[in-house]
C-alpha cells in the first residue's frame, strides 16, 4: 500500500497523502476505514488524544492500550510524540480540511455506517464519544491513484471547476519525483511486497544498507511514538547509516545530496574505497585510482582524458590546485570530489600522461584538462627577436677566421717581396681603362655616407684614377676595386706575367710622377689612403726600391707582407705635418721592412678585410 502511494504523483506532505497514511496505519485506532472501504470513521476524543493533543509529561507506553475513550492520561501521553503531524490542535480545523478537499459527512444509520470498521484494537463501536463518518469518491481503500483528483476547493478553484477548467494539483517536488522514479524501477525488480513493522516494541534503528538507486524498500514505515515521521529515510550512500530526521508530515523532507558521476552511475554502484568508510564522504572515491584507473570524462561527443600537465610545464607552473577547467566543457563533468587532493605518485604510468619523479614533488597537484600542444616546448619560452632563418646580411658578417689565419701564414711563409711597377702612360691609353678608372671614383663617392662636400673633395682624384688604371697597360690583370665604406681604399691588381726590369730612366720618370701625385693629393684634406697591391712581380733592381716614395701617418700601420708591396698615399689635412721619407736607399728600405716584419700583423685589419669577402681576391688568383 505504501508502495502504491509513493508511485502516485502527489506531494507526500499534502493533506490527502497524510490522511491516506493515517488511515492505513495500524498504530492509530482513532481513524479507520468503514466497512465498505469507501469512507472514514473518526473517533473524535481518541483522535484528539492521539494526534491533536499537545505534548505532555506522561509516558507513551499506555497509548492505545485502552479500548474506551481517550481523554485520560494515556491519551495525553500518547500525543506527546507527534505534536506537529498537524499544525492545529483543534478538531474543528481538521474537519474543515476534510470539507475543503471535498469530503462529505455521512448521516449515522445510513448504509455507510453499518458498524465499526475492521480496525484492530477496537473494543467497541466508539460509544464513549462521537463517531464521524466522512465520504469522498476519490478516497477509497486500495486505490491511491484517486488521490490526484482531490483538489483544494478554494473560491478560485471552484470557479475553474464551474467553468469546466482543469485545476492542476501541486506538482511533486524534486524529492518526490526521485521517489516516483525509484519506486517504479524497484517495483519491477522486487519479488516480495513491502513488509510492515509491528507497533512499539521494536526500536527504530539503522536498517541494513542497500546499494543501487533509491528504492521503495529503503523507506521503512515506523509509527512509534518517538519517531516524528511515519517513515524514515535511509541514505543510499554506504557512508551514512543514520536516519534522516523529519519533523512532521506537513513538511517536505530535504533529500541528501546524491549526484550521478560522469559515468552515469549512482554512488552505490561505484566501488568505494574502504579508507573513507567512516568519513561520511557523500561522493565515492574510486578505488585503485593511482595505478589502474583510466578515468575518462565524456562531455557531449568528444572523449577527454584526465591527464596531468606536460612535464615541460612543471617548471613554469608551480600550482595546479586551483586550476579551472575549460569553459567548453560542462562543469557537471568535473566533480571536485573525485580528484580532490590526490598527489600523483611516481609510478602513475597507466594514465595518458608521462609522470616523472620531479613532478611528484608537488603534493597539491590536481589533474586538470590541458589543451593539446603541437610542440613540447612553449613558444613563449623563445626570445621575441629570435631569427627564423639566416639572412644574407648575417651570412656576410660571418668572418671565416680560418681564412684570415691562412692568409697570415702565407704572408710569413714566402721570402719574396714584390713591388708595383708604376708606368706613367700618355693619353693614348685605351678608353676602357680610363672609363674604368672614372667608374671607381663615383663608386667611392656613392659608397661614402658623407655629404656633398666629401664628393667635392674627391673630384681632384679623377686624373689620379686615370693614371692608376693605366699603370698596368699591356698586362693581363683583374682589378677588384669595389670600394668599401671604410676610409681606406684598397686596389688589388693582379698580373699574369712579370714586368721587365726597370731602368734608371724609368725610375726618374716614376719620381716625377710621385711628385705630381703628392702635389695633387696634399690639396685634399680627406684622411683616406689608397693602397695598390700587385703580386707575382720579381724584385728586380735597387733602383725600384729607391724610387718608391711613401707618406705615412705614425698613427697608422702599414700591412706587413713578404708577398705584397704597398704604395700608400695618405691624403691628410694641409696643415697636418707629414713624414716624407724622400728617396731612401735600398738598405734603409730593407731595414724598415725588416723592422715591420718583426711586428705582428694587425688582426683587426685582417678581420675587416675578411669581412668584405667580395673585395678580397680568391685563392686561385692569389696563387697565380
From Swiss-Prot:
It holds the Pfam family HSF_DNA-bind. Residues 11-228 bind DNA. It comes from the Eukaryota. Highly expressed in testis particularly in spermatocytes (at protein level). Not expressed in fetal testis and ovary. The modification Phosphoserine is found at residue 600. GO terms for molecular function: DNA-binding transcription activator activity; DNA-binding transcription repressor activity; sequence-specific double-stranded DNA binding. The keyword Chloroplast does not apply. Disruption phenotype: Male mice are sterile. Show impaired spermatogenesis and spermatocytes fail to progress beyond the pachytene stage and are consequently eliminated by apoptosis. Spermatocytes show aberrant sex chromosome remodeling and silencing. It is found in: Nucleus; Chromosome. One of its GO terms (biological process) is spermatogenesis. One of its GO terms (cellular component) is nucleus. DNA-binding transcription factor that is essential for male fertility, spermatogenesis and meiotic prophase progression in spermatocytes under non-stress conditions. Positvely and negatively regulates gene expression to ensure progression of meiotic prophase beyond pachytene stage in spermatocytes. Plays a role in male germline meiotic sex chromosome remodeling and silencing through regulation of SMARCA4. Homooligomer. Belongs to the HSF family. This is Heat shock factor protein 5. The gene is Hsf5.
Amino acid at each position: 500500500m505504501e508502495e502504491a502511494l509513493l508511485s502516485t504523483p502527489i506531494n507526500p506532505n499534502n493533506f490527502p497523502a497524510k490522511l491516506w497514511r493515517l488511515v492505513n496505519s495500524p498504530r492509530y485506532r482513532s481513524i479507520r476505514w468503514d466497512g465498505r472501504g469507501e469512507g472514514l470513521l473518526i473517533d473524535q476524543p481518541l483522535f484528539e488524544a492521539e494526534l491533536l493533543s499537545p505534548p505532555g509529561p506522561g509516558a507513551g507506553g499506555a497509548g492505545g492500550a485502552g479500548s474506551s475513550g481517550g481523554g485520560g492520561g494515556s491519551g495525553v501521553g500518547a500525543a506527546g510524540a507527534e505534536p506537529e503531524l498537524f499544525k492545529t490542535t483543534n478538531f474543528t480545523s481538521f474537519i474543515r480540511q476534510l470539507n475543503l478537499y471535498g469530503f462529505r459527512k455521512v448521516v449515522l444509520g445510513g448504509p455507510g455506517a453499518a458498524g465499526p470498521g475492521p480496525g484492530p484494537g477496537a473494543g467497541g463501536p466508539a460509544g464513549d464519544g462521537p463517531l464521524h463518518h466522512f465520504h469522498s469518491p476519490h478516497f477509497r481503500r486500495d486505490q491511491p491513484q484517486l488521490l490526484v483528483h482531490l483538489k483544494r476547493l478554494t473560491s478560485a478553484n471552484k470557479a475553474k471547476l464551474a467553468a469546466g477548467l482543469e485545476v492542476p494539483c501541486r506538482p511533486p517536488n524534486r524529492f518526490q519525483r526521485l521517489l516516483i522514479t525509484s519506486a517504479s524501477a524497484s517495483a519491477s525488480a522486487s519479488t516480495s511486497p513491502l513488509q510492515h513493522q509491528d507497533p512499539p516494541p521494536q526500536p527504530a534503528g539503522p536498517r541494513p544498507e542497500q546499494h543501487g538507486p533509491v528504492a521503495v524498500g529503503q523507506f521503512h514505515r515506523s509509527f512509534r511514538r518517538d519517531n516524528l515521521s511515519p517513515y524514515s529515510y535511509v541514505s543510499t550512500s554506504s557512508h551514512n547509516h543514520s536516519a534522516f530526521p523529519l519533523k512532521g508530515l506537513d513538511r517536505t523532507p530535504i533529500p541528501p545530496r546524491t549526484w550521478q558521476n560522469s559515468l552515469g552511475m549512482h554512488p552505490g554502484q561505484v566501488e568505494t574505497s574502504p579508507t573513507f568508510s567512516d568519513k561520511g564522504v557523500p561522493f565515492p572515491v574510486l578505488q585503485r585510482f593511482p595505478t589502474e584507473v583510466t578515468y575518462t570524462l565524456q562531455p557531449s561527443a568528444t572523449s577527454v582524458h584526465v591527464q596531468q600537465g606536460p612535464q615541460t610545464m612543471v617548471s613554469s607552473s608551480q600550482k595546479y590546485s586551483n586550476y579551472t577547467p575549460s569553459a567548453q566543457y560542462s562543469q557537471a563533468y568535473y566533480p571536485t570530489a573525485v580528484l580532490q587532493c590526490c598527489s600523483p605518485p611516481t609510478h602513475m604510468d597507466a594514465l595518458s600522461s608521462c609522470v616523472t619523479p620531479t613532478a611528484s614533488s608537488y603534493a597539491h597537484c590536481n589533474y586538470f584538462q590541458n589543451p593539446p600542444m603541437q610542440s613540447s616546448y612553449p613558444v613563449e619560452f623563445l626570445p621575441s627577436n629570435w631569427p627564423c632563418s639566416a639572412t644574407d646580411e648575417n651570412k656576410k658578417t660571418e668572418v671565416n677566421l680560418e681564412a684570415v689565419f691562412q692568409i697570415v701564414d702565407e704572408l710569413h711563409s714566402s721570402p719574396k717581396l714584390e713591388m708595383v711597377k708604376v708606368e706613367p702612360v700618355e693619353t693614348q691609353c685605351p678608353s676602357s681603362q680610363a672609363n674604368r678608372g672614372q667608374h671607381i671614383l663615383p663608386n667611392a663617392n656613392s659608397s661614402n655616407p658623407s655629404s656633398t662636400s666629401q664628393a667635392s673633395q674627391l673630384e681632384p682624384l679623377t686624373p689620379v684614377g686615370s693614371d692608376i688604371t693605366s699603370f698596368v697597360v699591356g698586362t693581363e690583370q683583374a682589378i677588384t676595386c669595389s670600394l668599401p665604406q671604410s676610409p681606406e681604399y684598397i686596389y688589388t691588381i693582379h698580373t699574369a706575367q712579370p714586368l721587365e726590369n726597370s731602368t734608371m730612366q724609368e725610375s726618374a720618370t716614376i719620381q716625377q710622377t710621385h711628385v705630381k701625385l703628392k702635389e695633387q693629393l696634399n690639396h685634399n684634406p680627406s684622411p683616406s689612403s689608397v693602397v695598390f697591391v700587385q703580386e707575382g712581380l720579381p724584385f728586380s733592381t735597387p733602383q725600384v726600391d729607391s724610387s718608391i716614395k711613401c707618406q705615412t701617418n705614425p698613427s697608422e700601420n702599414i700591412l706587413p707582407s713578404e708577398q705584397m708591396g704597398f704604395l700608400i698615399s695618405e691624403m691628410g689635412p694641409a696643415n697636418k705635418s707629414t713624414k716624407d721619407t724622400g728617396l731612401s736607399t735600398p738598405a734603409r728600405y730593407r731595414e724598415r721592412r725588416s723592422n715591420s716584419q718583426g711586428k705582428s700583423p694587425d688582426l683587426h685589419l685582417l678581420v675587416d678585410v675578411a669581412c668584405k669577402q667580395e673585395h678580397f681576391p680568391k685563392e686561385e688568383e692569389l696563387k697565380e
